[in-house]
Amino acid sequence: MSDQVLSALEHFFLRWQRDGEARRGLPLCEWEADWRSPCELDEPREGRVAWRPHQRQQAADFAAMANALELVLHPAAQALFGHWFSRPIPCSYKGLRLEIILPWNEADLNLLRENLIGHLLMLRKLKRTPSLFIATTRNEMTLVSLDNESGQVWLEWLDSGRRLTLAPSLPAFLERLETLPH
């Protein structure tokens, strides 16, 4: 499963880069001296820096997080969050605009872990099955999530607990994403 996720993610990044760079060149983001990333390509100019998703040399370890939660994290989530650094990637899935969530640097990965822990604890308190958010939508109460048990990708309404299956797996979801301008 992890290899399939990594392959689908890499293909998505390549499509996103090709389409975006053909339209506007390299993506730019605000440069922050105390929030550097291996994604940065050049020196900053006028407070902005060009960037691209950057593959980590060594996968991030989620064992401590899983042990603290007494939960086995789905390998697809570990593959998604543990192998690349990136800004959020704007895209769409069957017309639904969203941003794939990925960590920008090691400190951001730690914040992501903390937010995932909070999300999982909230779901546990509400007696819902565990899911891991993987993308945001325009509605802050609606997330794209990975079902931690089955690996299905859901559209999840946090306020009601409603869940709609978008794809049978994370690789299938990633393969159907459409790129948006960056």
Curated annotation (Swiss-Prot):
It is a peripheral membrane protein. Signal peptide: none annotated. It is found in: Cell inner membrane. GO terms for cellular component: cytoplasmic side of plasma membrane. The lineage of its organism: Bacteria, Pseudomonadati, Pseudomonadota, Gammaproteobacteria, Aeromonadales. The gene is syd. This is Protein Syd. Belongs to the Syd family. It comes from the Bacteria. InterPro entries: Syd, Syd_sf. Interacts with the SecY protein in vivo. May bind preferentially to an uncomplexed state of SecY, thus functioning either as a chelating agent for excess SecY in the cell or as a regulatory factor that negatively controls the translocase function. It comes from Aeromonas salmonicida (strain A449). Gene3D superfamilies: Syd protein. The keyword Cell inner membrane applies. Keywords: Cell inner membrane, Cell membrane, Membrane. Coiled coil: none annotated. Its main location: membrane.
